[in-house]
């Protein structure tokens, strides 16, 4: 596959990594699994057995005219336990390497097809200045973008940190969710070559 950088230089990349047919079901499964794995899963509530108190029967079974009650910690009482209490849970789903690789290939290929992938020889800023990076993004017509480089430059990272809807990641930090979350993906040629090597 032959792609061009912003300056017009030709870059030859493999069809396997950047030209695969889009498989929506695969991408959906991998993205869902990734988001599920990010859940903390630490929420916890108490059942009627776990709430403190409630050992004494509030009133006798018969003769009061009131509805019978055996505990003040029944789920229908204020201060009672939850009927179906949530417990800590591991939400992570298993995704094998072949599926993950396939989803990344599909996403990268779709970015190319939708003209959302911008290849650059390199993207750097002379100082950690937000203003300088904003002007560079404006030149590339990419105000909301993920910037992917093979090695994250500290100046670039600091300059992007204060811009909403802009993020800087190294190739080893990129995940399926971040690739689809941004309007544009600005990628250095070196980063594209690394993806090609990893996904081919």
UniProtKB/Swiss-Prot annotation:
SUPFAM superfamilies: Ribosomal protein L4
Any GO MF annotation of the entry: structural constituent of ribosome
Keyword Ribosomal protein: yes
Gene Ontology cellular component annotations, sorted alphabetically: ribonucleoprotein complex; ribosome
HAMAP family in alphabetical order: Ribosomal_uL4_B
Biological processes, Gene Ontology terms: translation
Phylogenetic placement of the source organism: Bacteria, Pseudomonadati, Pseudomonadota, Gammaproteobacteria, Moraxellales
Role summary: One of the primary rRNA binding proteins, this protein initially binds near the 5'-end of the 23S rRNA. It is important during the early stages of 50S assembly. It makes multiple contacts with different domains of the 23S rRNA in the assembled 50S subunit and ribosome.
UniProt record similarity statement: Belongs to the universal ribosomal protein uL4 family.
InterPro entries xrefs: Ribosomal_uL4, Ribosomal_uL4-like, Ribosomal_uL4_dom_sf
Organism, as annotated: Psychrobacter sp. (strain PRwf-1)
Membrane-spanning residues: none
Stored PANTHER family: 50S RIBOSOMAL PROTEIN L4, LARGE RIBOSOMAL SUBUNIT PROTEIN UL4M
Region (Disordered): 44-71
Keywords for this protein: Ribonucleoprotein, Ribosomal protein, RNA-binding, rRNA-binding
Claim: RNA-binding is one of the keywords in the record: yes
Full protein name: Large ribosomal subunit protein uL4
